């Protein structure tokens, strides 16, 4: 029996404080056998690792979200690498650029993004990229940095246009799709992703945000990645179990430090 991995969730956010164990067990019982819990600021590093040590199929990343870049402008790639050496850490991020909200100055976001890239290049752990209203700058940085040495990565919660999709695929990156793809007003996104090879697609919730149809509007949780996966299986005209198997295989290829026990 095939299973799914939620490749991007935020389980240590306060939204899950009261019922985290129940949320995790609900995911396991729904066929979501693995979860990658994402770091957004330095204060989360140790709590994330502690959580992953409690559950064998939960892993974490280490990084600073662009919204928090101004609060961690002095963080070094050496510190990121130090935490990344932990057995339970399988990715770098989420990092990147967000020029929509601009909670942090653009220059600070760019500096931290490049430090994360250096850490990814050094460790060869995949970089998990957030980009919003910054696609051209993101593409430019990724192309220039890749010339210094390759690094694996994924564009998380992909909502961009074909230019970023092509640039990411050309660099060997993966594209992660969230519940947004199920929204009625996401026609442009669906048009962009229709030709992306299945070998490069991951699925995620970005929970507690972005609940997919038919549960849109409530708190999102890892179990709901099933809805997104089922929608995409139909979209790509592939049976559900094959889609589950393909996206899980993609996850294990990209995040090759992860070992999932399927019981």
Give residue spans per PLM region.
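Mid-domain alpha/beta scaffold segments of enzyme catalytic cores
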Residues: 1-263
């Amino acid at each position: 029996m095939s299973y799914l991995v939620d490749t991007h969730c935020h389980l240590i956010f306060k939204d899950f404080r009261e019922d985290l164990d129940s949320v995790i067990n609900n995911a396991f019982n729904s066929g979501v056998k693995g979860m990658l819990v994402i770091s957004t600021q330095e204060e989360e590093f140790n709590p994330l690792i502690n959580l992953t040590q409690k559950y064998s199929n939960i892993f974490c990343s280490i990084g600073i979200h662009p919204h928090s870049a101004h609060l961690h402008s002095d963080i070094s790639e050496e510190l990121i690498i130090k935490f990344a050496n932990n057995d339970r850490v399988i990715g770098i991020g989420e990092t990147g650029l967000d020029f929509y909200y601009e909670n942090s100055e653009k220059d600070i976001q760019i500096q931290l993004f490049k430090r994360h890239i250096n850490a990814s290049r050094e460790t060869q752990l995949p970089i998990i990229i957030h980009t919003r209203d910054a696609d051209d700058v993101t593409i430019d940085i990724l192309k220039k940095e890749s010339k210094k040495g390759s690094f694996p990565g994924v564009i998380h919660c992909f909502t961009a246009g074909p230019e970023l999709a092509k640039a990411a695929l050309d660099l060997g990156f993966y594209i992660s799709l969230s519940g947004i793809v199920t929204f009625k007003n996401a026609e442009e996104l669906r048009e962009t992703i229709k030709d992306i090879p299945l070998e490069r697609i991951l699925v995620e919730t970005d929970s507690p945000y972005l609940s997919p149809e038919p549960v849109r509007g409530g708190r999102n949780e890892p179990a709901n990645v099933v809805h997104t996966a089922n929608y995409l299986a139909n979209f790509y005209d592939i049976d559900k179990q094959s889609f589950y198997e393909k996206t899980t295989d993609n996850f294990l290829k990209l995040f090759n430090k992860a070992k999932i026990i399927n019981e």
